[in-house]
Structures are given as C-alpha cells and as structure tokens.
Amino acid sequence: MITRRYIFPGVIELNVQARRRLGVNIYLIDGGTEYALIDVGFLDELSDVLELIRQMDFSLSACKMILATHADADHTQGLARAREVLKCKVAAHPKSVAPLEEGDEVLTYARIDAQNIHIPMPRCKVDRTIDEGDVLTIGDKTLEVWSTPGHTAGQLSFRMGPLLFSGDNIFRDGCVGVIDAHHGSNLVDFIASLRRIRDCDATYLLPSHGPIFRKDNALIEATIARLESYTHMADFGTCAVDWPLLDQWEDELAAGKLDLG
C-alpha cells in the first residue's frame, strides 16, 4: 500500500499521487464510506489508474459514480471500461449523453482528420444526467453541479466548499480548452462561464489539465478579454460573433471608396 496524498481534505489528484503526468487530471473525491472519480482519462492508462486506486487501499466496489466533466476522449475514452470494472454509475450533462452513448468520434475529439488523429471511442451508457443546481452526495462530501458551457456544450464544473473543479474552462497559464465549432464550442457561452468563475468566491481552481492553482481574477479577466477579441475575428470562423472588417468594407463600397494605401 502507498500513502494517500491528499491535496485538500477528501481530494486526491491522481497525477500528483502518481508523481507523473497522465493524459488528464483525475480527481478522487473521498467521502469516507465511498468515493467518486471526476473523469478517468484514456483507455490505455486506465489499468494504471485502477491499480493506483487499489494501492491507496480504496476498494474498487466503493466507487459510487464517475462524473464526466464533458465528453472529450482524453477525459472519457476509458469511461465504458471503468464503469464495467468499478460497477458504478456514470453521470454526465444531458448534452454529453449522445456523444458518449454513440461513441461520436468527432464530437469527442477522438478523430481529427486534419491532424491524422484517430483513436477508438467506446460507447458508454450514461446512467444519470446531471445539470446546473444538482447536488451530489459522496459519503460525507457534497458537490454542487455547475453548467459551464463554452469549450463544449456539455462542460460541467463541480463546487465543493472553497474548491471548484473547473474542467477545461481555464488553466494556470490563462489558456482555455480548445475552441472549435465542429466540436460544439461557443465563444459567447465560454466568456459567460469564465465570468461566473471570476465572480465566484471559490479559492482554488482544480482544472482538468495542469496544476491546481489559486483563483486569480486578473488572470481570468485577461483571458476573458482575449476571448472577447476572438468574437470579432475571422480566425475563429463560425465561433465568431461578427467580423468588423466586412462592415467597414461594406461602408467603403457604398461610398465608392477604394483605399489601396
């Protein structure tokens, strides 16, 4: 057996526990008599994840549920197998149900043809849908479900006291989860979710990638400003709200103006 490395009371992060980087952050919420997992990562890492849980002297049968922050493959490719082994329920946002149950390779980012990325995405039954305002009890721990769309339509965060398990909303360097219209991203929703995180009284953000960090409103505000600029840039295609250049050009056309510098 190995010593459990609690970062906060009742919270173990498996990258920190293993002292090595996995494909995604996996949080174990220890409620005493039972526990839950937030995300499970890639299928080829699942055996290591389960072995690590065993080595920490947690019974596999004590897992109450797996919470999917969203349906992306790096968070959920191992979900079906984990559900089978742990014999627990899988909970996800209603908009994550179809991608997970259908094994949709595009919406889960398991297939990105332009980058020659293609990994299998096993179909996984979602036993329970969870959404904004739901409260989850894991032994003596309570998590409040937040709907924080933007990166994906089904992105969830989980509040536990001063902690916010914040998914792919924002990372310690100010980066955010990938923005891609084919993936279901929405910049306006993303900005609203970041504003909510900025304005909340959580002390720490526990993201799905990279280190846990103290909530920094200046960092979040800078990220919001950057994303707001994206809403007016052609670079972001249909994720953008408008493209001011074309409005300017329309005015120039109407005025018969040809400005060649």
What are these regions (language model features)?
Residues F42-L46, R54-V135, A225, H232:
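Active-site HxH/HxHxD metal-binding segment of metal-dependent hydrolases
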Residues I29, D39, V49, H70, ...:
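Divalent metal-coordination and catalytic microenvironments
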Residues G23, L100-G103, G174-C175:
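Short, charged, surface-exposed secondary-structure boundary motifs
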Residues P9, C88-K89, T203:
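A structural micro-motif
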Residues F236-G261:
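C-terminal regulatory/interaction regions
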Residues I2-M56, S157-G167:
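Conserved beta-strand hairpin/beta-sheet module of binuclear metal-dependent hydrolase folds
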Residues Y35, F42-D44, V135, T142-P149, ...:
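Metallo-beta-lactamase
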Residues I7-L14, D113-H118, D140:
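Short Pro/Gly-enriched beta-strand edge/turn motifs at strand-loop
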